[in-house]
Amino acid sequence: MAVAGSELAVKATERYELTLEQAATLAEFDDDPEMVRALVAAVKAGRFDHVAQRARDDRAQVAAYDQTTVQLTEQGVTVVAEPEWDDPKVRDIRSLRHGDDEATPESQAECPGRAAYVHVDRDWDSEQWEAKPVEVCTDHSTHGHTDPSDESRTTGSGGGRKKPVEQMTDEEREQARQQRRLVIDHNKAWTSATEVRRAWLAEWLTRKTPPKGTFGFVAGMIAAHPDLLPDLDANRLAAEWLGQPPASGYGRSDALADLIGNADERRAQVITLALVLAACEAHVGRDTWRRDGTTGWHGPYRGFLADHGYTLADIEDYAASNQTV
């Protein structure tokens, strides 16, 4: 029904070889022709799911931001843009002092520079994008505040020795700003890719027989990276992928144990593979893309998925390289 109600989706389906699910996704973005074109192009590149998920996440972030901004405005709060890392004036009120006392939103309620910016981030428990206001003073020194961190503020990114902000040239500051923006954008891309990858794994692991190379991969990961397996979150992920309830105890899943006990030999091997893959995923963090992907378990893990039909997102290709940030 969603496809039939979208002229763009109907035309794209007639012109390109789209699945019903892809056509429904196009209908979802019927009000954004540019995004529809990007999605159609992604079909050819095999990255449709990645582009769609990033678009959904972007929309969810904007919606969360707008909702919180409206609420703050209705409360009479001045909303400002989130400051750059080296902003000389805007500071989080909680990082400031006023005289001998720590500044708080309550104690600085009458500060002329009081405002707030809206920060949107992923809540990993609810798996939703949430917007939170951060109260600031828009000109802390003018309004009588001091920031104890001013004397030690550095670039805060990259390797090597960090240079204090006040010693940086304009060019170095701009490079640091661009680096920070890149990290923020790549963090968002990684979050979207993780969503797609885990959905793909859940679908792929419904199979009844183990894929080619399972034994070598599982044995190799256990032998070379035994530290992966004890992660408590691994059983939760594996149970979720395999359609089982979450662990009933400290890292233990009775449902998974029962599932293996009732499975035939081939399906039990698939479940074992799921446990190892879940152990890898449990060690994936927001900063995983920043590490050298040619060392440790990262390379073999992503290589195994790619060999079996998973299309890496651009950020996952980056993560598989030896590039670091």
Placement of each model-derived feature along the sequence:
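Accessory, typically intrinsically disordered or conformationally flexible segments
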Residues: L8-V325
